Amino acid sequence: MLKLKPAFALMLALPVIVGCSTNDNRYDPVDAPEIKNLFSLDEVWSSSTGGTGDFYSELTVAFDANNVYTASRDGDVMALTLDRGSKVWSVDLADEDENDERRSARVSGGVALGGGKIAVGSENGYVYVLNAKDGSILWKQYIEAEVIARPAFSASGDKLFVLDARGNFTAFNALDGSKLWVTGDAPQELRLRAQSNPLVVGDEYVLVGTSSGKVNVLLQSNGSTVNQVNVGESVGKTALERIADVSSSPLILGNVLYATSFSGGMVQYDLSTFNYIMRLGYQSSRDLGYDEHSILVTADDGTVSCINRADSSQRWANTSLGYRQVTAPVVFGNYAVVGDYEGYIYFLDMQDGSIDYMEQSDSSGISAQPKVQNGKLYVMAKDGSLNVYSYTDQARASAAVSVEQSNDMLAASAAAGLTLNHPGVYDGGIYAPSGVSQEALEQRRAAIIRAVAQQEAQIAAQRRAAEEAMRARAEYEKRRAAYEEERRERLSGFGIAQGIRSDLDEAEDTASESADTEYVEENNTEATTESTTNDSEDDNTKSSGFGIY
């Protein structure tokens, strides 16, 4: 479920409550579908990890070769073995001094894993980095703002990137917690509670969505913004209409960036040519699912859609889970798997979107995206139950592993060898570090302005061309309709009633009249001649030539 900032949410809620006498239930969740399961699912193991209770949170798990790492809202961070779910270690962050006067540690962003370390963020404004081997706290930093999004380590694990609720994006030295740089966009007046999880590309770039509807591409070295992809536009008369957050995580597959926004649809952007491939009308605030051939989108109304990567066509859309607070999807074998607010998990066939299996994993509900690791499905419930499943059908299990391996390869090769800097934008980007002179900063700013202007001009030209084509088409249809109407009016009397004459009849009559005229004129000439030579003839004889008698 989407949540807005509390103060604004309350302001928005008041008029809704006052005006609800009409019993409008358009946004009420539909009942869970009733289906006949086509296969069985085995529970491998289950463990309690603390959970998030009644609070909205997308806290999810992280994996390494041997363990799965979890965190709860209260501050319980633990490592469990992948094979049996046995506890390796656990740490309670609520025991830290800074949380003594708080209700709990209020962990809300995590879990991130990299370089033998794990990281989580809290609504209390703290970032914690722990040793993945034993859970010992390596360092912590207070950043004076809530951390909702999951932090991200660089590929080598030497940097940690954190997005806070104010829109600030901070890079830390992952070894000692020292701050390397800070950048960011000013937050919008009204925005979603959820935030985009940063996406790391090697040790050079990091991508993050913003509340202004953009995906920023930054250099890990100094935080400079070297490219910016417009996904949603913050337009409208009211703050509510202007919500355009990119709160889903950016996704890179090959050379293509995929991103969705709350109100602006989905964008496919070619990172090798810096051109927009396609804009599609799939609005979402949840992360995307994918495999080698497909992109999966969960809309905020509960619709789950499958898009063909090859041509961006829609393969299917399942609308049977309307407003059930459906999670982000994940591909597991031949299925797209999602959860909902009542704790059901659904297996949607990747070919046609039909639900082939459903089960209530936990009655407390599911808000975090399910995860797949080593051919097994990991489902985290709101009460902290971590349930792990596998297929009974070995063929399906093999398919699940195959898809997982393929996805790992896609993720590992994301943007490999690409330069993500927009043409004309170099290391300085838009936001330069403090060591850069004002003159150099202005030069870089001018370069980015020119690049953006060129891009906007190209988009505007394309838009004008499309509008002109639409106007020409409309004019053509208007003229065609007028012609057809005129033609129908001209032809409406053919053979229907006497006295209605066609164009052919008129032409024949005209020809006949012309012939008669010539005949009359000829006779008149003869009559005149005859009259001249026979003036003395009888009047009755002359009159007889005119057809009177």
Regions found by a protein language model. Give the residues of each.
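Short loop/turn segments that connect beta-strands within beta-propeller blades
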Residues: T81-R84, N131-D134, N173-D176, Q220-G223, ...
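Loop/turn-rich, solvent-exposed surfaces of beta-rich toroidal or solenoidal domains
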Residues: T298-C306, S313-F347
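Extracytoplasmic beta-rich repeat domains
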Residues: D24-V30, I35-A62, K87-A112, W139-S156, ...
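Long, low-complexity, compositionally biased polyampholytic IDRs enriched for Lys/Glu and Gln/Arg
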Residues: Q438-S492
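C-terminal motif of bacterial Sec signal peptides marking the signal peptidase cleavage site
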Residues: V18-G19
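Structural signature of WD-repeat beta-propellers
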Residues: S72, S122-E123, D164-A165, T210-S211, ...
